[in-house]
Amino acid sequence: MNVAIIGAGINGLMSALELSEQGIQVHIYDQQQAGLEASWAGGGILSPMYPWRYPQAVNTLAKHAKYLYHQWNEKLFPITGIDFQIQQTGMLIFDHNDFAQGLAYAEKYNEPMQRCEKISQSKIKNINPRVSKNLQEAIFFPELSNIRNPRVLQSVIRYLQKQPNVQFHENIKISNLIPNKDEVHAIQDHNQNIYFHDHIVIATGAWSAEWSKQLNIQLPVYPIQGQMALFKTPPHWLPTMCMNKVMYLIPRQDGHIVCGSSMKDIGFNKDTCNDTQKNILAACFEMIPELQKFPLIKAWTGLRPSSPHGIPYIGQLPHLKNVWLNTGHFRNGLCMGAASAQLLRQHMLSQPLIEDPTPYSPNQLYI
């Protein structure tokens, strides 16, 4: 089997990893270098933010993915020398309006990753002494982890580059799908070069709607811009992740702290905005006032692939027997990525599935 994967973000790369490990010949195409865009830009929380606000289909993939990332890191790190830097820092959430829902969710699903308790200021101080004294209560999720997105991407790319059955085609924009009855028998790039493959996987994230006309479906995936900021503190200065009013702080092992994130529906605009950055910083300083003492290293944006309810499309297109989707992960592309790729691989190779595929089925695009 020879598979073309269009898109080299986390979902395209993890799909390539899953398929290539089964001995399949994989070709990865991207309009720029592999591992950029939203996959690189995200914060790397290994759980949906406020999981009770999401459909359970999203949380299910996130649950599987957390364990898969640990397994992949154990396999790839000795070969690539790049550690994913998975940290179980836990998270403090300060949104009072979410306390009851969060506690009820944890009790209902009884997942270790989502175990939580409501705590008062004295315990908050013991867990994270950097938190503002104005925040009197929180719910604490001790099992929540984060992962360093760029390092995951670098490790996976380096590993795949070493595999004889994987080939990267970077800076090549695939612009056309060439149909033949009930399948796509070739793809064409912007320079009119044609490539023949047995199967096609579309993993183009925020750009996925561009395929709607050629696929004769309406693929409702479009970009939502998110802005981030990065501070540098001493290592281990901030002991936990923190979140309030959809803004978060994520500590890295080396003392960098990722702050985010905004949501703007402004197309493919990737410019940062001073007002948005001010809002992000104000929200983060409200949680951790001492952060203001440290240097702001940089700010950036990413384009999330928004989809209805944030549930990705994973599976085969019914009217094109060799075209598959793995896209539309919205804010949880990396969070769900490892499990999404595993589910896709199981689909493509007719293997037992980790979960009921119905919520992710492209069949719903035809209703």
Residue map of PLM features:
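Helix-loop-beta segment of a Rossmann-like dinucleotide-binding subdomain
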Residues: 81-93, 105-108, 115-163, 262-266, ...
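Dinucleotide-binding Rossmann-like beta1-alpha1 core, especially the glycine-rich loop
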Residues: 45-127, 283-285
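Active-site substrate-recognition segment that forms the wall
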Residues: 14-22, 31, 44-46, 82-87, ...
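Residue-level detector of alpha-helix initiation sites
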Residues: 5, 9-10, 33, 206, ...
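C-terminal catalytic lobe of FAD-dependent flavoproteins
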Residues: 288-290, 294-367
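Short hydrophobic core segments
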Residues: 4-6, 195-207, 341
